[in-house]
Design a protein with these regions (language model features):
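Short, surface-exposed loop/strand segments
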Residues: 1-70
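A structural signal for isolated positions on well-ordered beta-strands in alpha/beta enzyme cores
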Residues: 5, 73, 120-122
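Short, conserved catalytic/metal-binding motifs centered on acidic residues
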Residues: 9-10, 74, 132
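Activity-critical C-terminal alpha-helical subdomain
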Residues: 77-141
């Protein structure tokens, strides 16, 4: 069985991997594991998402060192693209790039920073939560 890990920014993305992507992948002989990045820890518990890129970088480095993962994915939304992340300077609106162009530039910057051929980044233009609410509003959820 193939093993894929996906670094996600929060609980919604973790649920998406566990309840949507995971079952679909398992029908193809692939096991998908979500890993939620911890951006800070306090006495009241861990915080996930947002934060600085250093937390994502450390976790990605660790996951890429593990040779048993056939693929190492990254699922981020454009709105919460972390401070200090590769390509962050192109993430702000400009006249030269539309949203799709910025998304493409971010993923290119991520692949350049982590050239491991197993690495597969995805920067989603809209928050996963917004897509879920849109599906519910459309009568599909």
């Amino acid at each position: 069985m193939r093993q894929i890990v996906i670094l996600v920014e929060g609980q919604t993305e973790e649920t998406l991997v566990n309840e949507v992507l995971g079952p679909a992948a398992s029908m193809r002989g692939t096991y998908v594991t979500p890993v939620v990045v911890t951006t800070s820890a306090t006495p009241t518990g861990a915080h996930h998402g947002g934060g600085h890129w250093k937390h994502y970088h450390a976790k990605l480095q660790s996951l890429l060192k593990a040779s048993h993962w056939e693929r190492v994915g990254l699922l981020l939304d454009y709105y919460q693209y972390p401070k200090g992340a590769p390509g962050r300077e192109v993430a702000t609106p400009s006249e030269s790039l539309d949203s799709a162009g910025r998304q493409s530039a971010l993923m290119t910057a991520l692949r350049a920073e982590y050239p491991d051929p197993r690495f597969r980044p995805l920067v989603v233009l809209h928050e996963i939560e917004a897509l879920v609410l849109a599906a519910i509003d459309a009568g599909r959820g």
